[in-house]
């Protein structure tokens, strides 16, 4: 399956602006942020809103993310260990998959905060990204959830004991083919959590897929 995270487009910086002057008529333009009146002229200042947003966590080099995870002693646990920690040590499983996947089946008691969500905005940059996904036949393109940390903070304090989970989970363990492991949504989420002050972060090795494969209990949420 083709995967696309972003498309670089030559949009001007948000600091650039066009100044249009008219001696007698008022100019109207979509996207006008502010207008300044100049003696004898009416001046419109149009500020570009199509600038690419700040670099998302997914685009930070995996080596850099992995180093921080190891430095903060983020440890991977298998599904049976995760279940034990959840039952005996008040660990919370944080499922970072899309909401629809979470509702279709998740570990009992797990909470959901999406690491990625459907693209919601309609700026020029977001339209370009939608077109890029559509080029590959993908009509439900996703973006990193800019409210991920705020949403987690609303549910879990910085002292909470968290096991981050996604579908297949990736790994920090080196292999012959992947000497630095392989990143995943849950490892990117774990990186953001420790970067923002969470102190007890674990990672579910094998992900929700392995949880179900091992025959561990799963809850579903039916749509109304």
UniProtKB/Swiss-Prot annotation:
It is found in: Plastid, Chloroplast. InterPro entries: Rhodanese-like_dom (IPR001763), Rhodanese-like_dom_sf (IPR036873), Str14 (IPR043186). PROSITE patterns: RHODANESE_3. The active site is at 166 (cysteine persulfide intermediate). Residues 1-48 form a transit peptide. Keywords: Chloroplast, Plastid, Transit peptide. SUPFAM superfamilies: Rhodanese/Cell cycle control phosphatase. Its main location: plastid. Residues 87-220 form the Rhodanese domain. One of its GO terms (cellular component) is chloroplast. This is Rhodanese-like domain-containing protein 14, chloroplastic. It comes from Arabidopsis thaliana. The lineage of its organism: Eukaryota, Viridiplantae, Streptophyta, Embryophyta, Tracheophyta.
